[in-house]
């Protein structure tokens, strides 16, 4: 049958189902196909903390949202235009967010009495008229998948049922004209060791595509043209974890230092350990430590031994690492601490995002121990942030804290791959012995950085430890005047990093008296909200901080720091729901202050 093709500038699609329905997989694969089409995109995975939450319940709903467009986009979208719901719970959990007219693609087979009761429905929403405000497409995905898999030798009924996410992916791939060859090759590679499962998933995907092509339910196919305002280069789809890993590896290559990551598993930082462990061929060493304190100690030991020492964690782990980070500040050794923030306090909501560790990163150590703090704002920007963290750590002989978050770590975007040889070199400038001269381990260069002496180097033996050091010699000292001088030197060294920080860019309009200022992963949302506010006639400026200590100068933490340092009036807008900010929320806050 002949179908109408309509063009769209942008679309937001959300896949939702049980945590065992493969929604993250389907969404990720749709994202890769979209990247190959040349669209700009941003994604937002959202899943429960449990490995397998109770099937069919609201608590067990897993979702993956992708916003793709023919122009530059800044966020994963506030709410979807299309919801793919694999069961009643997925529909009910997401329905409150949807606008009237949203397209619903529903797995009709799952709307049985048992699943409806689990989701808290007294009546079937497919039959009671409650969805009349939406464009509803009822598709028996499970039964059509089972039928497509029939006859495949070795494929069980369970294999057929589990492949329904690939059926849904096939339908959406047809609906938006996504290429299929890449997905088919991906299926063949992923299930190469299980021939029956491979054939079942291929059959399900092909059946979904064919259903879209032939059914009268879907009479329109949509086309989103490739983005045209993209600088030339080689691009890949990348999430924040992968970009951060590649940034650390690039810093290792450009400095000539071996990279060691020591971490204790903790959501959502564990993915960094998993990703870097895949790159042993590049000289990367990874250690899964027995606890957070041991992991920090291993990273610091690696730095003492002349490597690029890195440890990664999330909020609760930062509490445990604090003493070792303070030791690193006293030893003045280059070390990188990655904090992938999550909703807290305590265990909190491990898979939900939050920017709530700012004050801990800046001030969360006993004594006077200031450290540089960097926060990337986009998944691709995690590469540059990791590389810069290594530059600062090595150049200034200091631990550096890099604040990512769960949203940044798991969301993705097209990223232009840099040429490693074009990146600046990083000189470790290891200390060397000079005949007839006493080695002074706490002498200072023009940056106030001390020498980095590799253990075992003749003539460079020196004392380390947490006790205060005498200026220059590094001997243990309890002298009050010396302690004051060393405290001032360490602080001045960190303050001096500001000379390497570029001026803060302010996106201003003439006459603007309102500045929207943020940090971390809120940048895209802020820029999108400001864009909308300007289109509505408001005059507003925006700026974003990537360096939180020292300033190039969220919760209310950023406001506290700004008030304390600059004595300016700051109005804080905070959201503590485990989800990123929405552009519409920023737009509303601007309108209320005009």
Report residues per predicted region.
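Thiamine diphosphate
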Residues: 10-99, 246, 259-260, 267-363, ...
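Peripheral docking tails and interdomain loops at the edges
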Residues: 19, 141-144, 150-155, 169-173, ...
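Internal gly/pro-rich beta-alpha loop/helix module
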Residues: 135-180, 184-212, 381-394, 403-469
